[in-house]
Structure formats: C-alpha cells, structure tokens
Amino acid sequence: MNPEPKALSLIVYDFDGTLVNTLADITDSVNLALKELNLRSLSREIIRAYVGGGMHRLMEQALNGTGYDDIKHAVTLFRKHYGDHLLDQTEFYPNTRETVEHFSNKKNVIFSNKPAAFIERILNALDFRHPFHAVLGGDSLDTRKPDPSGLHLLMRQFNCSPEQVLMVGDSAIDIETGKRAGVWTCGVSYGLGNSQALQESQPHYMIDDLSRLKALLK
C-alpha cells in the first residue's frame, strides 16, 4: 500500500548518508582522535559501518579491541577534531537541494543522531537551512533513534497523524524508528548504511536517488 500523496504533510529526513555525504570528514576526525590516543587508524569503509548511532556509539566501536576504554574522552577528542574539519569534504548528495525544495508545500524536517549544532553548521555553511522547519539532533532529546520519541514530538509540533508522515533514511535504524512511530518509511540505497540491513528492515519504499521521491509522491 502506498501513501496517498495529498495526505502527506511532513517529510522527515535523516542527515548523514541521506542528505549529505559526511563520511570523509567523519573518518578523518575519528582517525585524528585515535592518533592522539596513540591508537591505530581505521579505513573509511570500517568507519562507514559505525556511522548512524551517534558519536558515543561511533567512538565506542572505533575503540573496540584497542584496550582503551575512556570513551567519554575519545568522544571529546572526536568532537574537537570534527568541529575543525566539519566541512573539508562534506557535500550534498546529487539532487538533494532540488528535491527538498520541490516539497516546499510540505513541512521538511531533519531528525538525526548527529548533534544538532553540527547539523546547523553544515546547513548554514552550504546555504540550505531555509527549507527545513525543524532540526532534531542526537542531543535534542534524552533519547536517540531508533527510539521514536523524536517523531512523536514532530507529529505533535506540526499537528500530524502518522499516516501523514514519511521518514526517509539510509539505515535500518531510520526505518525501525519510522515503523515504531507508525509512519511511512523510505530507504535510500545510495547512503552510508548497510544495504542488506536496510533491505531487511523492509521500508515501504526504496529509492536509489532522492529525486525519485518526486515521482513517488506526485
């Protein structure tokens, strides 16, 4: 069953791996933190598998097997380096701008496990804060995805019922979040998330380019 396009009033986007490709800058920042701790570096593909669960989870996995267990300090180091290298190589995925702007008749929001301040900095630097009616980051609430509390908050804020909401993301975490909130879900296959896990999460839609949302929801 497909959502009735006229009924959809709120589109909720994940950030990393959905709207922007941040992998290179995240990888460099993780490795700078690891270097400062005199630990081995990790490849981009390894770190790619760690993105999506928030900074604490990212560094917890990056430290796995090293014997170093001060995750809080590692997160502090990562945050410092990432703040310095946030926009070195980060860029929008193809067709992101035009697709989000196409849905200007709906509410467009971001719901990510990334700290909200980093999201805001990237959007402002890329001159694309204006289309989004709200930004929820991993530190905006006491919970993070896949907990659906953020979606519940957004539905209350914009006076939407679940059938009026579409959650778009590149990971199984995003799809699980949407399903737990009872909203429509759309997976994007071009992002950073594990493609097999994304498929197995069984989103209502699966697209290989964000612009395909326009045809799905026309």
Model-derived regions, located:
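Helix-loop "lid/cap" segments that line or gate small-molecule binding pockets
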Residues: 33-34, 54-68, 122, 154-155
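Short, acidic loop-to-helix structural element flanking the phosphoryl-transfer center
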Residues: 7, 84-110, 116-120, 148
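Short helix-capping segments at alpha-helix termini
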Residues: 35-40, 66-69, 127-131, 159-160
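Metal-dependent phosphoesterase signature
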Residues: 60-101
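Active-site neighborhood of HAD-like aspartate-dependent phosphohydrolases
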Residues: 2-49
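An amphipathic alpha-helix signature
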Residues: 27, 31, 44, 48, ...
